[in-house]
Each structure stands twice: as C-alpha cells, then as structure tokens.
Amino acid sequence: GDSITSGVGLADMKYNIAQIGYDLRPNFEGYSSQCYTALVGKGLGLDRQHAINLGLPGLMSPDMLDMVQNSAMPKMNQASGAYYVYPEYQEYLRKADIISIQIGSNDALVPCIVGLGEATNWKSEQLAALMVSGALRDFNFQKLGLFLEALNRMTLTFDESRATNRLLFRGMDEICDQAYTNVTASLPQIVAGIRALNPDAKIVLLGYTNPVPLLPAWNRYFSKLNRFAKDLATQEGLIYVDIPRAQTAADGHPTVKGHQYIANQILNALK
C-alpha cells in the first residue's frame, strides 16, 4: 500500500531519513500498534514477524507495479517524491499467506494538490489542507462556505484565480481521468505479478475512501475506482473490502478510528 497502509499520521510510525527520501524498513515490522496492519495481525493471532507492513508513502499504482515486479522503482516519482528500493520486497510477497493491496488514491490526489500549488504559486496550503481533511466529507452549506472562504483568503492575482478555477472546475476531471487510466492499467498487472510470485496466497483488495466528496471530480474518480476494484475482485477471485467511511485526519490519512474501521472490515471479510 501507500501512506494509508504505512500509518502516516499515527504517533509511532517508524522510518529513517534516506539519501533520497525516506527509508521505511523500520516500519515493516516496527509499525504503529494503531495501524490496520497491527490490528488485523492481532485479530489473526500473528506477531510482527508474521504481519508485515509494506506501506510506502507517496506510492502510486505504477510505482507499486515496479515494486512487485522488481522490488524497486527505477527512478524517483517526481510528483510525490517517492523512491524505494527494497530487495526483500518480493521475498515478503513470496512467503505470505494473505496479501492486502491498497493503492490508487495518490494517482489522483498528488497531481491535484501539486496542480493547485502551481496554479496559486503555492499560496494554497490552507485550501489543500481543508480539501484533504475530511471536514468536507458530508456536504452542507456551512462547509461549502468554509471552502469558498479558504479560496477568498488566498488573495490570488487574476492569472492565479483563472488557473485555480480552471483546475477546480475542469482540470481536476482531466487529472482524475488520467489517474483512473493509470490505476486500471496497473492494478490487474499488480495482481498478476503477485500471483506469479505466490499463486497460493489469498489476495485482499481494499476499496477507496474519498476524503473530499464536495469535489465532483473526486466523487466520480473514487466511485469509478470502487466499481472497478469490485469487478476486478470478482473476475480474479480476490477478497474485496469496501471502506467508504474510513475517518480521515487533517492530512487526509486515516485516524485511529479510521484504521480500526479498516481493520474490522478486513477481518470481517476474512471470516
């Protein structure tokens, strides 16, 4: 998975600073006791040597495909800053009895937020935080007002306003369409790659939570992805786990309750 799986936002997530980016090896077995990997492992009676967290922050679906096929990314993902090389990655997959896949959110979220930064000349930090906070999850006019107020506080130039409006009302559709193409091309290959390494493992495919249902482009993106993932699971004999109401924090990652919810959904699906 990506940062959702790794436990970004939880207090005791483990990592080291690497020459390029971050080294997540300490988190493979030293992950937060509050993340869903820990909770699922506990529910299945597994210790940390038998419940491994391969969540890698910033990962997009083509990056995961590289990791599954080569245990390495050939180059840094410039949009997300992710770059990982772990020779042991494939070996973990070969030895597993159950493998969960959580990937695809960053394929849209990262380029959308980068696009917003570029459109506003990086005046958009507060708006971006609001967009991914989960505060806009349930639409009402008060929350629409918060969104518009954050827009107004940015004090944009004419060109910045025009670029921002284009992104919000047209550009995000283009980004999400491309992201959907990327995920739907990569995900079946990820499943095939895992099966080539370990044909006997149960594969659990997690669905998606939309942190910003107020944005129509993201609504469509995550709705389409959930339908695709569910259909893929049916076609490939995977265990599909729906997580539509995972609670997210200010950075868009699951809260402690969000991880508990995801873990419960997985454990129920494995019964």
Model-derived regions, located:
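Serine-esterase "nucleophile elbow" of acetyl-processing enzymes
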Residues: 1-57, 99
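Flexible, glycine-rich phosphate/dinucleotide-binding loops
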Residues: 6, 60, 212
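Short, solvent-exposed loop/turn and secondary-structure capping segments
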Residues: 8-13, 64-66, 110-115
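Glycine-rich, phosphate-binding/catalytic loops in enzymes
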Residues: 14-23, 70, 115-121, 221
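First exposed extracellular module after export/assembly in secreted or surface-exposed proteins
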Residues: 49-52, 65-66, 196
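Acidic/His-rich segments in extracytoplasmic proteins that coordinate ligands and/or metal ions
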Residues: 53-54, 66-68, 72, 91-96, ...
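Charged, often glycine-rich, active-site loop that binds/positions anionic groups
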Residues: 57-85, 253-254
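Alpha-helical cap/lid subdomain in secreted, periplasmic
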Residues: 77-271
